[in-house]
Structure formats: structure tokens, C-alpha cells
Amino acid sequence: MSARGKIIAILVAGMVAMAIAVPMAMSDDVGTSATVNNLAPDVAITTISPDPATPPCTVTVSGTLSDPNGIDDVSTLTYVVRKPNGSTYTSGSATVAASWSFNFNLDSYADAGTWTVEVTATDKGSLSDTDSKTFNVSEVIAFSIDFNKTNYGSIDPGNASTVSGDTTMETVGPAPPVKPTIKNEGNTVIDIQMSITDDASNPEPLFVGNTSATVGSVGPQTLTSAATTFDVNIAKGDTAKIDTTLSVPTGTSPGDYAGTLTITAVSG
């Protein structure tokens, strides 16, 4: 074999050896695993408005909500509103959202004092978080009466005329035929103050000092131009009767007389 032929044979043999040395391609699958822990949501009340609240009114509660597993992991957002004595006033559910709010109404008789709102977020794994915040309800003194005039009729000097009340609220009108009643429309116990004045056109003073009143079971007390207090303690939502009597002194000039009865409620 010539020298050239030997070189070619050697090159070919080398190439074959190189081809045999290259490994064939291979693959395999390896499983992986992990556990993502469920963590509790985080809820916070940011504002309660108005504070203080004056009933009757609507109260708005706002706040924030988050969850390490995502907001979609939160299943419910519930609330409880508690009175100053801790009893439940109202409860319900709010829409689950990163920024949430809900409203509730305070009625006229909502107790004055410190109220509490509790909000609870619960996720799909039953983990929960609760936040609470207080707000104040103002004292409201309010009342209504069912009479707009008291007519004692014609009275002889030396005699008296009484207009009696009852505890049933009627359509507002003159007494009689209406039987005077007062109702506590506020959110606290009230006492009553009453005063009376004579019109300047009267022939002489008549009502001042000659009119007496009984509120509920308190009285009779003589009414003057200064306020007289009836310690009657009318509870919120309750009523009391008002009886009044006009005594006409002997020697009183004949004629038509008019006056003004002023009724004021104060905290009892």
C-alpha cells in the first residue's frame, strides 16, 4: 500500500472511532412536590362615620381586607354592632373586597353611650381574623305631644276647670276633645318642665299662679312663668298623661283670656 493510502485508511479509522464514542440522547421525569400553607386573612376597620352619631341616622363603617393566599381565598366578611350593654343591635354580611364598607341605621331610641362594631373575615380554610372599633352615640332629648291648645271653657269666679289627659297618643288637636299625652321620642329617660304665661291683652293676669298640672303621677304642682320640674322619669318610647286645672279666683274680671303653656324635656 502506498503512503497516501495508509494516511487515508488511518483517517477513516479515526473518524469511525469518534462516531462510536458519542453517547446516545436520553431523558427521564422527576416528580416535584410542595405544600402552600393556608394563612389567616387580615381585616381592619379604618373609619366609622359619623362619630359621634346623633340618632336617627345612618352609620357607615369602612375598612381594608387582605389575605396572604389572595383575596379570593376569603369566603365571608361579617359584622356585629353591639349596644353599650354588649347586646347585639344588628348584624349582617358585607361584600368581600380589599376596600369594603357597609351601612346600618340607628333608630330614634338607640341608646346613648359607647357602641362597638366587630368585623370578621373568614377564609375557605376556616381561618379568620376579627377587628373591632368603638363609636359614640349622642344623647337625644326629644318628645311629642298630641294637643295644640287647652280650652278650659267658661268658668265662674271661685270655680275651676280641669282638662284630663291619658297615655294614648292621638291625632294632634285641641284639648278637649283630645286628652293630653306626652311621649318620649328620644334615647334617654326624660323629666318634664312646664311654665305658663298670660297674654298681654288679658284683662288681668289669670293663668300664672292659678294653673296646676300633673304629669304622669307627679303633681299637682302650681305653674308660674318660671319652669316647674316634674320628676316623672319617662322612659324612651313611653308616654305619660298631662292633667291641667285652671282655678279662677273670686273677683276676676270678666272677659276672654289667653295664655301660653311651655313644655320642655330635660334629661331624667
Model region roles, listed by residue range:
Residues 2-47, 126-160, 164, 187-188, ...:
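Short, polar/proline-rich extracytoplasmic segments that appear immediately after membrane translocation
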Residues 54-60:
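Short coil/turn motif common to extracellular beta-sandwich-like domains
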Residues 60, 155-228, 262-268:
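Surface-exposed interaction patch
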Residues 63-71, 83, 123-125, 182-188:
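Extracellular acidic, Ser/Thr/Pro-rich low-complexity tracts
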Residues 65, 69-90, 192-195, 256-260:
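Short flexible loop/turn segments that cap and initiate beta-strands
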Residues 91-93, 106-107, 228-234, 248:
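Beta-strand-rich interaction surfaces with strong enrichment in secreted/lumenal proteins
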Residues 95-105, 111, 237-242:
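Aromatic sugar-binding surface patches on proteins
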Residues 113-119, 240-242, 257-259:
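Exposed beta-strand face motif in extracellular beta-rich ectodomains
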